Amino acid sequence: RKGGDIAVETTKWLNENGIPTQLHIVGIKSLDDKIKNLPFVQDIGFLNKNNKTEYNRLIDEIYHCHALILPTHAECSAIAFAEASAYGLPTFTFQTGGIPNYIENGRNGYMLAMNSTSEDYGRLIAQCLKDGRLERMTNSAKEVYLEKLNWNVWAKKMNNLITDLTDK
Protein backbone atom coordinates (compact mmCIF):
# COMPACT_ATOMS: atom_id res chain seq x y z
CA ARG A 1 0.00 0.00 0.00
CA LYS A 2 2.84 2.43 0.75
CA GLY A 3 4.50 1.90 -2.64
CA GLY A 4 7.80 0.53 -1.39
CA ASP A 5 8.30 -1.38 -4.62
CA ILE A 6 8.12 1.85 -6.60
CA ALA A 7 10.52 3.59 -4.20
CA VAL A 8 13.04 0.76 -4.61
CA GLU A 9 12.68 0.67 -8.41
CA THR A 10 12.93 4.47 -8.61
CA THR A 11 16.17 4.40 -6.63
CA LYS A 12 17.48 1.66 -8.88
CA TRP A 13 16.53 3.70 -11.97
CA LEU A 14 18.28 6.82 -10.63
CA ASN A 15 21.48 4.85 -9.95
CA GLU A 16 21.36 3.22 -13.39
CA ASN A 17 20.99 6.67 -14.95
CA GLY A 18 24.05 8.17 -13.32
CA ILE A 19 22.52 9.70 -10.20
CA PRO A 20 24.07 8.07 -7.12
CA THR A 21 21.13 7.51 -4.78
CA GLN A 22 20.54 5.77 -1.46
CA LEU A 23 17.09 4.73 -0.22
CA HIS A 24 16.72 4.92 3.57
CA ILE A 25 13.76 2.74 4.52
CA VAL A 26 12.23 3.68 7.87
CA GLY A 27 9.21 2.12 9.55
CA ILE A 28 9.38 -1.53 8.56
CA LYS A 29 10.14 -3.97 11.36
CA SER A 30 11.20 -6.83 9.11
CA LEU A 31 12.32 -5.84 5.62
CA ASP A 32 12.56 -8.62 3.04
CA ASP A 33 16.18 -9.79 2.62
CA LYS A 34 16.10 -9.34 -1.16
CA ILE A 35 15.39 -5.62 -0.60
CA LYS A 36 17.60 -5.24 2.48
CA ASN A 37 20.62 -6.61 0.60
CA LEU A 38 20.40 -4.22 -2.34
CA PRO A 39 23.54 -2.04 -2.42
CA PHE A 40 21.54 1.21 -2.48
CA VAL A 41 19.18 0.36 0.41
CA GLN A 42 19.72 1.44 4.00
CA ASP A 43 17.38 -0.57 6.24
CA ILE A 44 16.73 1.66 9.26
CA GLY A 45 13.84 -0.39 10.63
CA PHE A 46 10.98 0.76 12.80
CA LEU A 47 11.74 3.75 15.02
CA ASN A 48 9.53 4.62 17.97
CA LYS A 49 9.19 8.41 18.21
CA ASN A 50 8.24 8.04 21.89
CA ASN A 51 11.70 6.64 22.63
CA LYS A 52 14.21 9.52 22.80
CA THR A 53 17.10 7.52 21.32
CA GLU A 54 15.00 6.24 18.42
CA TYR A 55 13.44 9.67 17.86
CA ASN A 56 16.92 11.21 17.66
CA ARG A 57 17.92 8.52 15.16
CA LEU A 58 14.88 9.42 13.03
CA ILE A 59 15.81 13.10 13.09
CA ASP A 60 19.38 12.20 12.14
CA GLU A 61 18.11 10.14 9.20
CA ILE A 62 15.90 13.02 8.05
CA TYR A 63 18.82 15.45 8.17
CA HIS A 64 20.89 13.14 5.97
CA CYS A 65 18.23 12.78 3.27
CA HIS A 66 17.28 15.08 0.40
CA ALA A 67 13.70 14.00 -0.32
CA LEU A 68 10.90 11.71 0.80
CA ILE A 69 9.57 9.22 -1.70
CA LEU A 70 6.31 7.72 -0.47
CA PRO A 71 4.35 6.53 -3.51
CA THR A 72 1.42 5.37 -1.41
CA HIS A 73 -1.64 3.97 -3.17
CA ALA A 74 -4.09 5.00 -0.44
CA GLU A 75 -3.66 7.72 2.16
CA CYS A 76 -6.16 9.79 4.09
CA SER A 77 -3.85 11.86 6.25
CA ALA A 78 -0.13 11.22 6.31
CA ILE A 79 1.69 13.01 9.09
CA ALA A 80 4.91 11.96 7.32
CA PHE A 81 4.21 14.56 4.61
CA ALA A 82 3.88 17.36 7.17
CA GLU A 83 6.99 16.18 9.01
CA ALA A 84 8.96 16.02 5.76
CA SER A 85 7.99 19.61 4.97
CA ALA A 86 8.97 20.73 8.48
CA TYR A 87 12.48 19.44 7.83
CA GLY A 88 12.67 20.75 4.28
CA LEU A 89 12.31 17.40 2.52
CA PRO A 90 10.39 17.63 -0.75
CA THR A 91 7.97 14.71 -1.10
CA PHE A 92 7.33 12.61 -4.21
CA THR A 93 4.06 10.68 -4.01
CA PHE A 94 0.88 9.70 -5.83
CA GLN A 95 -2.09 12.05 -6.08
CA THR A 96 -4.62 10.10 -4.06
CA GLY A 97 -6.89 10.46 -1.04
CA GLY A 98 -6.04 13.34 1.25
CA ILE A 99 -2.54 13.91 -0.13
CA PRO A 100 -3.46 17.15 -1.98
CA ASN A 101 -4.10 18.65 1.47
CA TYR A 102 -0.39 18.22 2.22
CA ILE A 103 1.52 18.49 -1.05
CA GLU A 104 1.61 21.51 -3.35
CA ASN A 105 3.21 20.56 -6.66
CA GLY A 106 6.45 22.44 -7.08
CA ARG A 107 6.47 23.89 -3.56
CA ASN A 108 6.96 20.97 -1.18
CA GLY A 109 7.08 18.11 -3.63
CA TYR A 110 5.11 16.53 -6.43
CA MET A 111 2.07 14.30 -6.72
CA LEU A 112 2.18 11.99 -9.70
CA ALA A 113 -0.77 10.34 -11.45
CA MET A 114 -1.74 6.96 -10.01
CA ASN A 115 -0.59 5.18 -13.17
CA SER A 116 2.93 6.63 -12.93
CA THR A 117 5.85 4.21 -12.96
CA SER A 118 9.14 4.14 -11.10
CA GLU A 119 10.72 5.55 -14.26
CA ASP A 120 8.27 8.48 -14.14
CA TYR A 121 9.31 9.13 -10.55
CA GLY A 122 12.98 8.81 -11.47
CA ARG A 123 12.72 11.17 -14.43
CA LEU A 124 10.93 13.80 -12.34
CA ILE A 125 13.46 13.58 -9.51
CA ALA A 126 16.35 13.73 -12.00
CA GLN A 127 14.85 16.81 -13.65
CA CYS A 128 14.30 18.48 -10.27
CA LEU A 129 17.96 17.86 -9.42
CA LYS A 130 19.16 19.14 -12.78
CA ASP A 131 17.18 22.39 -12.85
CA GLY A 132 17.51 23.27 -9.16
CA ARG A 133 13.88 22.65 -8.19
CA LEU A 134 14.84 20.11 -5.55
CA GLU A 135 17.01 22.65 -3.76
CA ARG A 136 14.35 25.39 -4.07
CA MET A 137 11.68 23.05 -2.71
CA THR A 138 13.83 22.46 0.37
CA ASN A 139 13.16 26.06 1.39
CA SER A 140 9.58 26.28 0.16
CA ALA A 141 8.68 23.00 1.89
CA LYS A 142 9.50 24.65 5.21
CA GLU A 143 7.29 27.59 4.20
CA VAL A 144 4.37 25.25 3.45
CA TYR A 145 4.83 23.66 6.85
CA LEU A 146 4.78 27.04 8.61
CA GLU A 147 1.79 28.26 6.57
CA LYS A 148 -0.50 25.26 6.91
CA LEU A 149 0.98 21.95 8.06
CA ASN A 150 1.64 22.53 11.76
CA TRP A 151 -0.43 22.06 14.89
CA ASN A 152 -0.65 25.79 15.68
CA VAL A 153 -2.31 26.51 12.33
CA TRP A 154 -4.65 23.54 12.85
CA ALA A 155 -5.59 24.83 16.33
CA LYS A 156 -6.39 28.30 14.96
CA LYS A 157 -8.55 26.83 12.20
CA MET A 158 -10.39 24.61 14.68
CA ASN A 159 -10.90 27.53 17.06
CA ASN A 160 -12.30 29.66 14.23
CA LEU A 161 -14.59 26.84 13.11
CA ILE A 162 -15.92 26.26 16.63
CA THR A 163 -16.37 30.00 17.17
CA ASP A 164 -18.26 30.32 13.87
CA LEU A 165 -20.53 27.41 14.77
CA THR A 166 -21.27 28.62 18.30
CA ASP A 167 -21.92 32.20 17.18
CA LYS A 168 -24.80 31.12 14.91
Each language-model region and where it sits:
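Aromatic "clamp/platform" in nucleotide-sugar-dependent glycosyltransferases that forms part
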Residues: 73
